[in-house]
Amino acid sequence: ILGPVLGLVGNALGGLIKNE
């Protein structure tokens, strides 16, 4: 359960950081 959730969260954070 935590695997996919962490993946989605990491992806979202990565996108925000890349946008900055």
Swiss-Prot record:
Keywords from the UniProt entry: Amphibian defense peptide, Antibiotic, Antimicrobial, Secreted
Classification via InterPro entries: Bombinin (IPR007962)
Entry keyword annotation includes Secreted: yes
Pfam families: Bombinin
Function: Has antimicrobial activity.
Subcellular location: Secreted
Organism field: Bombina maxima (Giant fire-bellied toad)
GO terms for biological process, alphabetical: defense response to bacterium
Cellular component, GO annotation: extracellular region
Superkingdom to which the source organism belongs: Eukaryota
Family of the protein in this entry: Belongs to the bombinin family.
Tissues and organs where the protein is expressed, per its UniProt entry: Expressed by the skin glands.
Name this protein carries in UniProt: Maximin-Ht
Lineage, broadest ranks: Eukaryota, Metazoa, Chordata, Craniata, Vertebrata
Intrachain disulfide bonds: none
The keyword Secreted is assigned to this record: yes
